[in-house]
């Protein structure tokens, strides 16, 4: 059967995404004011979280994707704890059209990595003497769009004459 232009739609193999490896690339937890920071506080600490995603090619169809999660909990001017996790994965993407490669690497792959990174953060904070920090789910589509808008704005700023 053809699709009207003579091409056989069944001839194109479906896209494939395989997870080849997952690993902690970097993990840091700091509890700079222990043991005083472990005492009950009047107010819950303010917790700020930053999440970034990166990807780089290892081979034609293999890519490393990194999910970086940084956080800091502060009570007033005192740092209760801070952490940084860079969690990586190696993915094989086969038969993925070029225009879908970036969204696959920066949306779908981090979505697969996030539950494991979330558990590592929760356990690290708990092992540091605090209640486990359960990160909220991340909308990687919105994060991807924000990053694309920032890149477009930065390129626009570079193109403008002075």
UniProtKB/Swiss-Prot annotation:
InterPro entries: SecB, SecB-like_sf. It comes from the Bacteria. One of its GO terms (molecular function) is unfolded protein binding. Gene3D superfamilies: SecB-like. It is found in: Cytoplasm. Keywords: Chaperone, Cytoplasm, Protein transport, Translocation, Transport. One of its GO terms (biological process) is protein transport. One of the proteins required for the normal export of preproteins out of the cell cytoplasm. It is a molecular chaperone that binds to a subset of precursor proteins, maintaining them in a translocation-competent state. It also specifically binds to its receptor SecA. Homotetramer, a dimer of dimers. One homotetramer interacts with 1 SecA dimer. Belongs to the SecB family. PANTHER family: PROTEIN-EXPORT PROTEIN SECB, PTHR36918. HAMAP family: SecB. This is Protein-export protein SecB.
